[in-house]
Amino acid sequence: MASPALAAALAAAAAEGPNGSDAGEWGSGGGANASGTDWGPPPGQYSAGAVAGLAAVVGFLIVFTVVGNVLVVIAVLTSRALRAPQNLFLVSLASADILVATLVMPFSLANELMAYWYFGQVWCGVYLALDVLFCTSSIVHLCAISLDRYWSVTQAVEYNLKRTPRRVKATIVAVWLISAVISFPPLVSFYRRPDGAAYPQCGLNDETWYILSSCIGSFFAPCLIMGLVYARIYRVAKLRTRTLSEKRGPAGPDGASPTTENGLGKAAGENGHCAPPRTEVEPDESSAAERRRRRGALRRGGRRREGAEGDTGSADGPGPGLAAEQGARTASRSPGPGGRLSRASSRSVEFFLSRRRRARSSVCRRKVAQAREKRFTFVLAVVMGVFVLCWFPFFFSYSLYGICREACQLPEPLFKFFFWIGYCNSSLNPVIYTVFNQDFRRSFKHILFRRRRRGFRQ
């Protein structure tokens, strides 16, 4: 692993000073402090072993974050089961996490291990803005996803027609613009230690107005919106479940689950797979009588044809539905007089059967889509919950410091721990998708092991 080399590079940079010269050189300033004296030795706060250990842990976290989120992007863009327009939100969210791992975390690690900012004044402002931007974009993405879930639950048909890839992409652009507006202030008002400080530091604006406004805009307000939206989704889902259970009624005497009004078993709405109908439930009595009349005519025509051909098959068929279908196919193929007599009725039955199969297939697809939406909503609820758990300690302690300053300030090691726990969230979303979503799990396996299978075949 490259952690010893990284630790050595950090130690060399600390000894060399910022920007490759004296430790005191910063922006337009010189290589000494205001009094003209040298800065002295770098303020190293970790031993060489601790530097190597922390670099190894954070390096693994960075690699894991990048690889996991790249897999998410590839899975959504290549898997047929994940190609729904709303999954573009996950692509954008994964992209934000990749940018956190590549553009923010390495510099945060260097700043932590070296105990001062080595990379100059301009990059300090850019780094702070990117840090706030990517964190804010993550939670604004989750907020937009929660609204998407709410509309897909409460306005399923209308909203699904409107939710095109173009609309989703426009929403994603709006999410990034909102995040940029919230994160722009660090570019123009980042905080810098006074000249009397030992080494240059890079930190966010320390004024109370900025601390509170950034915490509210970047975390607390989106969290409130997500909480209210998901509470509403839960209420709607609970009401629908109660209504469906009342319509279905109790289970049959044999303990079997009741069949829905479209002839599909209950499993179709729960696990996303269409179960074959246990019984044929007709929409109304008149259409059922009409079908029985057609089947009777078909059987009579089939018997006449069988008598003409000398067939001695059994009169007991496998069931009215199957007998009708088989009779229709046989009659349509038969050139005999019995086939001609029953051709009109066989065509009508074949038309009815094909229409019923299409209707059943349509209902099946709708049930599968609803089950997928349900699972997707649950997975995203887990993603949002984990995000809040990871970032709440940092934002709460940071806003508390903005209100009452030193009286409420946490010990510095604990505050830094909360800070890095927030960064860890960027690596958790792929794990959540793998654990809770079968489509992602299957797609990840296909991506990771496809080449290995090809190698074995060759």
UniProtKB/Swiss-Prot annotation:
<dbReference type="GO" id="GO:0045907">
    <property type="term" value="P:positive regulation of vasoconstriction"/>
</dbReference>
<feature type="topological domain" description="Extracellular">
    <location>
        <begin position="115"/>
        <end position="124"/>
    </location>
</feature>
<feature type="site" description="Implicated in catechol agonist binding and receptor activation">
    <location>
        <position position="214"/>
    </location>
</feature>
<dbReference type="GO" id="GO:0005886">
    <property type="term" value="C:plasma membrane"/>
</dbReference>
<feature type="transmembrane region" description="Helical; Name=7">
    <location>
        <begin position="417"/>
        <end position="437"/>
    </location>
</feature>
<feature type="topological domain" description="Cytoplasmic">
    <location>
        <begin position="232"/>
        <end position="379"/>
    </location>
</feature>
<keyword id="KW-1003">Cell membrane</keyword>
<comment type="function">
    <text>Alpha-2 adrenergic receptors mediate the catecholamine-induced inhibition of adenylate cyclase through the action of G proteins.</text>
</comment>
<keyword id="KW-0325">Glycoprotein</keyword>
<feature type="site" description="Implicated in catechol agonist binding and receptor activation">
    <location>
        <position position="218"/>
    </location>
</feature>
<dbReference type="GO" id="GO:0031694">
    <property type="term" value="F:alpha-2A adrenergic receptor binding"/>
</dbReference>
<dbReference type="GO" id="GO:0045211">
    <property type="term" value="C:postsynaptic membrane"/>
</dbReference>
<feature type="transmembrane region" description="Helical; Name=6">
    <location>
        <begin position="380"/>
        <end position="403"/>
    </location>
</feature>
<keyword id="KW-0297">G-protein coupled receptor</keyword>
<feature type="topological domain" description="Extracellular">
    <location>
        <begin position="192"/>
        <end position="207"/>
    </location>
</feature>
<keyword id="KW-0812">Transmembrane</keyword>
<dbReference type="GO" id="GO:0007186">
    <property type="term" value="P:G protein-coupled receptor signaling pathway"/>
</dbReference>
<dbReference type="GO" id="GO:0051379">
    <property type="term" value="F:epinephrine binding"/>
</dbReference>
<feature type="transmembrane region" description="Helical; Name=2">
    <location>
        <begin position="89"/>
        <end position="114"/>
    </location>
</feature>
<feature type="transmembrane region" description="Helical; Name=1">
    <location>
        <begin position="52"/>
        <end position="76"/>
    </location>
</feature>
<dbReference type="GO" id="GO:0004938">
    <property type="term" value="F:alpha2-adrenergic receptor activity"/>
</dbReference>
<feature type="topological domain" description="Cytoplasmic">
    <location>
        <begin position="438"/>
        <end position="458"/>
    </location>
</feature>
<dbReference type="GO" id="GO:0043025">
    <property type="term" value="C:neuronal cell body"/>
</dbReference>
<feature type="glycosylation site" description="N-linked (GlcNAc...) asparagine">
    <location>
        <position position="33"/>
    </location>
</feature>
<keyword id="KW-0472">Membrane</keyword>
<dbReference type="GO" id="GO:0098839">
    <property type="term" value="C:postsynaptic density membrane"/>
</dbReference>
<feature type="compositionally biased region" description="Basic residues">
    <location>
        <begin position="291"/>
        <end position="303"/>
    </location>
</feature>
<dbReference type="GO" id="GO:0045666">
    <property type="term" value="P:positive regulation of neuron differentiation"/>
</dbReference>
<keyword id="KW-0675">Receptor</keyword>
<feature type="transmembrane region" description="Helical; Name=3">
    <location>
        <begin position="125"/>
        <end position="147"/>
    </location>
</feature>
<dbReference type="InterPro" id="IPR000735">
    <property type="entry name" value="ADRA2C_rcpt"/>
</dbReference>
<dbReference type="GO" id="GO:0030424">
    <property type="term" value="C:axon"/>
</dbReference>
<feature type="topological domain" description="Extracellular">
    <location>
        <begin position="404"/>
        <end position="416"/>
    </location>
</feature>
<feature type="topological domain" description="Cytoplasmic">
    <location>
        <begin position="77"/>
        <end position="88"/>
    </location>
</feature>
<dbReference type="GO" id="GO:0043410">
    <property type="term" value="P:positive regulation of MAPK cascade"/>
</dbReference>
<dbReference type="GO" id="GO:0042803">
    <property type="term" value="F:protein homodimerization activity"/>
</dbReference>
<feature type="topological domain" description="Cytoplasmic">
    <location>
        <begin position="148"/>
        <end position="168"/>
    </location>
</feature>
<dbReference type="GO" id="GO:0071875">
    <property type="term" value="P:adrenergic receptor signaling pathway"/>
</dbReference>
<dbReference type="GO" id="GO:0007565">
    <property type="term" value="P:female pregnancy"/>
</dbReference>
<dbReference type="GO" id="GO:0070473">
    <property type="term" value="P:negative regulation of uterine smooth muscle contraction"/>
</dbReference>
<comment type="similarity">
    <text>Belongs to the G-protein coupled receptor 1 family. Adrenergic receptor subfamily. ADRA2C sub-subfamily.</text>
</comment>
<dbReference type="GO" id="GO:0098978">
    <property type="term" value="C:glutamatergic synapse"/>
</dbReference>
